[in-house]
Amino acid sequence: MQEQSPELYEEVKLFRNAREREKYDNMADLYAIINTIQQLEKAYIRDCITPQEYTAACSKYLVQYKVAFKQVQCDEFPSVETFVKKFRLDCPAALERIREDRPITIRDDKGNTSKCIAEIVSLFITIMDKLRLQINTMDALQPDVKDLADNMNRLSLIPEDFDAKLKVEKWLGSLNEMQASDELSEGQVRQFLFDLESAYADFNKLLHSQ
């Protein structure tokens, strides 16, 4: 029996250094997000998820797509279409959603409403992620919470007495009373995160009702 060459058992590396590894990781992230949006569109068409679940998930993934594509965009991939073609991704529904930059459940008003909704979704996710990572100083949280409150006030479909908006404004008021280096206690972080998760769920319900 002929012996196998030892070279056949050597590990094949896709990258030669940390920079190349980061490049491949970024491309893998973008590939996964585009594929996820494609599968989400199929799930919605087949009534596998509710419109509320779809709207929330799609808004989130469109925000993540923008961040991921910026990490990959270069001369080789000037557009998402070139990336999709290069890696032979079959994702027409995802590309349509990316071009429209809004869930199919949200009506188009020349991008004003959809842009504001995307900002709100992005800020909810950003603030909740910070709290989960124990980033709890006033100067790290207040700018994002202020932007969230401003965007919620700007979105005309949100009522003045909307509970989710009032919760965000309450926490903004609390942060405004703190010094820049002051930290939220463990109990405050837990309550803040609970209030944000509740507010985010209520916001998604409101989108579904439109």
Swiss-Prot record:
> Which InterPro entries does its entry note?
ESCRT_assembly_dom, Vps28, VPS28_C, VPS28_C_sf, VPS28_N, VPS28_N_sf
| Main location per the UniProt record | other
Q: Where is the VPS28 N-terminal domain?
A: 1-108
A GO biological process of this protein is: multivesicular body organization
Q: Name one GO molecular function term.
A: protein-containing complex binding
Where is this chain's protein located in or outside the cell?
Endosome
Q: According to the UniProt entry, where is the signal peptide?
A: none
Its Gene Ontology cellular component terms are:
ESCRT I complex
Recorded superkingdom? Eukaryota
The VPS28 C-terminal domain sits at: 112-208
Name the phenotypic consequences of knocking out this gene. Death at the transition from the first to second instar. Morphological changes in MVBs and developmental defects in the compound eye. However, for the ligands and receptors tested, changes in their cell surface levels or their delivery to lysosomes have not been detected. In early embryos and during sperm individualization defects in actin cytoskeleton organization ocurr.
> Which SUPFAM superfamilies does its entry note?
Endosomal sorting complex assembly domain (SSF140111), VPS28 C-terminal domain-like (SSF140427)
Keywords carried by this UniProt record: Endosome, Protein transport, Transport
Identify its protein family: Belongs to the VPS28 family.
The protein's assembly and partners: Component of the ESCRT-I complex (endosomal sorting complex required for transport I).
Outline what the protein does. Answer: Component of the ESCRT-I complex, a regulator of vesicular trafficking process.
- Name by which UniProt lists this protein: Vacuolar protein sorting-associated protein 28 homolog
Q: Which gene encodes it?
A: Vps28
